[in-house]
């Protein structure tokens, strides 16, 4: 699939899931912080660290693994919620976007399904969540640029972050 969309999907999921009162979302910043702890602990900087180990390091009970498939429409977005201790799947969900412009709406539907699947107590509250395309943006390129900005900022690259934020 189009790998430039992966960051956009995860950024959109983070924005959507942060609306939950019952889920404690650590987000990309915590992930990058945990990853940095591995790299400063004498590990090779180019070392690939499994997401499960990073989730353990930051104290997460569960973590998300998501991807988007399809180099062109239709796009399939899949999301697994995994138990940090056992790596067992707590939920495995999928949404389809018929065209690129529909990806933010598909992310919103997927986040709503994740919240319900994880037992968010009030289905009404989940349904009242502000869709990504209204809360932030309906533009996938803007989501991707924002994700690049967040990643650059967390890596200490402020000039790159500013450029990416301006593009978003």
Residue ranges and their predicted role:
Residues 1, 37-38, 104-155:
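Mid-sequence helix-capping/hinge segment at a functional interface
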Residues 1-78, 83-100, 124-138:
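Short beta-strand->alpha-helix linker/helix-N-cap micro-motif
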């Amino acid at each position: 699939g189009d790998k430039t969309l992966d960051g956009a999907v995860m950024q959109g999921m983070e924005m959507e899931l942060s609306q939950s009162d019952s889920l404690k979302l650590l987000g990309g910043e915590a992930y990058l912080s945990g990853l940095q702890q591995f790299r400063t602990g004498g590990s090779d900087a180019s070392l690939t660290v499994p997401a499960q180990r990073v989730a353990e390091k930051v104290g997460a009970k569960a973590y998300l693994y998501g991807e988007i498939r399809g180099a062109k429409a239709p796009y399939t977005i899949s999301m697994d919620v995994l138990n940090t201790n056992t790596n067992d799947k707590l939920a495995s969900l999928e949404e389809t976007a018929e065209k690129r412009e529909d990806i933010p709406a598909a992310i919103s539907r997927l986040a709503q399904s994740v919240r319900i699947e994880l037992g968010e107590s009030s289905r009404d509250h989940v349904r009242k969540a502000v869709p990504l395309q209204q809360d932030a943006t309906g533009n996938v390129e803007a989501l991707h640029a924002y994700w690049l900005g967040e990643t650059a900022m967390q890596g200490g690259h402020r000039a790159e972050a500013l450029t990416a934020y301006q593009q978003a």
